[in-house]
C-alpha cells in the first residue's frame, strides 16, 4: 500500500485550484452572496473594483467599475493616489444615495486591503477636503474618517496622521475643487460586509453610505471542499493563470452552459465562446468610452467594431491585432515599462500622421484609440497627448493647436494632470504606470522633445 504523501496532496490541490471549472464555480457561489447584498440595497449603485471584483457581479446589475489598488493600503505604504481619483463615483453616489463596491481577496485574508484601507483613506480624504477645507461650516461636528474596527490601533493612528497630507495632494492635483464641493453634499461613510456578516440594510442618513463587500468567504489556506467542489477563496484573482482568455462579460452571458460543461471539455468550450463573441454581428462600439465632447473614443481593441458606412472615422490601433478596416493606423505599443519608451519613440510619427489627415481628425465623427489593455495605459496616454495639444481644459478644440516643439512653453505638469483627471473621470479603467506618465511629461514638457509637428 502506498504511503500518503502530504506534499503530493497539497500539490494536487494547487493544480485543481488553477482549473477554470473550480474557479468559475467558486465565483458563481460568491456572486450569489453579492446578489443578496445588492438586493438589500436596491437603490445603491453596484461597483466592481478592477480587476478581481469584476467577476463577482452579474451583468444584469449594470455595474460600473473603479480601480482602487490594494498596494495603496499596504501597511506602512498607505497612499492616496491622484492618478486613480475615481471621482466618477461621486455622480453615482449622489444620484443613488449610496454605492456597493465589490472586491475579493485570496489566501485566507478577511478582506482585501483595497476595501479595508485604500477606499476608507479615499473616503476620508474627500470628506476632509470638502468639509474641513472647502465647506468647513456645512457639517462642523461630523466624523469624517472611518477605518474598520479590526485594524490595530497603531495602524489606525498612523493612517489618520497622514490624512492631512493626502488632502494637500488632492487640492494640488488640479481637479475642479468647486465641482467636488458641489457634488459632495454630505460626507461619505463606509460600511464593511463579508459572507460572515449578518446581512442588514443598514445605512446612515447623515452620510452617503458606501457598502464595501468582500465577495469571498475567508477559509483556512484559501481552499475548501464543503460546497461539493474545490472552493477557491478570491477565485477571480490572477485571471491570466486560469481563465484561458474568458472574460467576465462572456462568463455572465453564458453562465449556465459554462458551469454545466464537463471539466475536461471546458477549455474547448471557452475557446468556442470567445470565437463566437468575436464574430458576433450584433456588437457595437458601446464598450468603448467616448471622451465627450471630443470625437475621441478609447478602449480595448476587442471592443471595436466598424461604424456605419456613412461615418467619418479614424482608428489609432496600438495593439498587435490588425483590425483590417479603412483609415487604420497601427503602432503596436505594449503595456508597462517596456511600452513607455516605445510610446515615446512612436508618438512624433503618430502626430505627423494625424496632422496629415484630410479632413483633420478633429473634424471627423469619431477617432478610435484602441489597445490591448482596456485603454488602461497606451490608448489613454495617447488620448492625453492629443487633448493636451489640441483641446482646452473644457475639452473644446483650440483655435490654434499647440505644436510638440512648443508644448513646453504652453503646458505644465498641472495642466497635464488636469487632462488626465478628466480622462479618468470618463474612462475609469485609466491607470497609466509611472513609466508611461514620465514618457508623456518628457514629450510635452521637455525642451529636448523632437520637433515633428
From Swiss-Prot:
Please name the GO terms that the record assigns under molecular function: pentosyltransferase activity; tRNA adenosine(64)-2'-O-ribosylphosphate transferase activity
Source organism's superkingdom?
Eukaryota
Q: Name one GO biological process term.
A: charged-tRNA amino acid modification
Coiled coil segments of this chain: none
Recorded GO CC terms: cytosol; nucleus
Family membership: To yeast RIT1.
> What is the protein name given in its UniProt record?
Uncharacterized protein C3F10.06c
Amino acid at each position: 500500500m502506498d504511503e500518503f504523501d502530504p506534499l503530493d496532496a497539497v500539490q494536487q490541490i494547487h493544480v485543481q485550484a488553477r482549473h477554470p471549472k473550480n474557479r468559475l464555480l467558486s465565483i458563481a457561489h460568491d456572486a450569489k452572496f453579492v446578489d443578496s447584498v445588492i438586493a438589500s440595497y436596491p437603490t445603491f449603485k453596484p461597483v466592481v473594483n478592477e480587476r478581481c471584483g469584476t467577476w463577482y457581479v452579474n451583468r444584469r446589475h449594470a455595474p460600473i467599475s473603479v480601480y482602487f489598488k490594494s498596494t495603496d493600503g499596504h501597511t506602512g505604504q498607505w497612499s492616496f493616489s491622484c492618478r486613480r481619483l475615481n471621482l466618477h463615483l461621486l455622480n453615482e453616489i449622489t444620484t443613488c444615495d449610496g454605492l456597493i463596491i465589490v472586491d475579493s481577496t485570496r489566501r485566507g485574508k478577511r478582506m482585501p486591503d483595497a476595501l479595508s484601507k485604500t477606499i476608507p483613506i479615499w473616503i476620508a480624504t474627500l470628506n476632509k477636503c470638502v468639509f474641513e477645507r472647502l465647506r468647513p461650516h456645512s457639517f462642523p461636528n461630523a466624523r469624517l474618517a472611518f477605518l474598520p474596527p479590526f485594524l490595530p490601533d497603531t495602524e489606525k493612528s498612523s493612517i489618520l496622521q497622514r490624512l492631512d497630507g493626502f488632502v494637500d495632494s488632492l487640492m494640488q492635483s488640479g481637479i475642479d475643487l468647486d465641482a467636488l464641493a458641489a457634488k459632495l453634499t454630505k460626507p461619505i461613510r463606509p460600511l464593511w460586509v463579508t459572507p460572515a456578516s449578518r446581512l442588514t440594510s443598514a445605512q446612515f442618513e447623515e452620510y452617503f453610505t458606501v457598502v464595501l463587500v468582500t465577495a469571498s468567504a475567508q477559509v483556512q489556506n484559501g481552499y475548501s471542499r464543503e460546497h461539493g467542489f474545490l472552493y477557491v477563496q478570491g477565485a477571480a484573482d490572477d485571471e491570466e493563470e486560469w481563465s484561458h482568455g474568458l472574460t467576465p462579460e462572456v462568463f455572465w452571458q453564458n453562465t449556465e452552459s459554462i458551469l454545466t460543461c464537463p471539466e475536461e471539455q471546458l477549455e474547448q468550450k471557452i475557446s468556442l465562446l470567445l470565437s463566437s463573441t468575436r464574430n458576433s454581428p450584433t456588437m457595437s462600439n458601446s464598450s468603448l468610452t467616448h471622451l465627450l465632447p471630443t470625437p475621441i473614443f478609447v478602449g480595448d481593441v476587442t471592443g471595436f467594431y466598424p461604424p456605419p458606412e456613412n461615418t467619418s472615422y479614424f482608428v489609432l490601433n496600438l495593439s498587435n491585432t490588425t483590425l483590417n478596416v479603412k483609415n487604420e493606423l497601427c503602432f503596436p505599443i505594449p503595456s508597462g515599462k517596456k511600452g513607455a519608451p516605445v510610446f515615446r519613440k512612436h508618438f512624433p510619427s503618430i502626430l505627423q500622421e494625424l496632422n496629415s489627415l484630410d479632413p483633420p481628425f478633429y473634424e471627423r465623427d469619431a477617432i478610435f484609440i484602441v489597445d490591448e489593455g482596456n485603454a488602461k495605459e497606451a490608448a489613454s496616454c495617447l488620448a492625453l497627448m492629443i487633448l493636451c495639444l489640441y483641446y482646452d481644459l473644457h475639452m473644446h478644440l483650440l483655435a490654434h493647436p499647440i505644436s510638440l516643439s512648443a508644448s513646453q512653453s504652453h503646458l505644465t505638469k498641472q495642466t497635464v494632470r488636469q487632462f488626465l483627471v478628466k480622462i479618468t473621470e470618463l474612462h475609469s479603467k485609466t491607470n497609466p504606470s509611472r513609466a508611461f506618465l514620465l514618457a508623456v511629461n518628457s514629450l510635452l514638457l521637455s525642451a529636448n522633445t523632437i520637433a515633428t509637428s
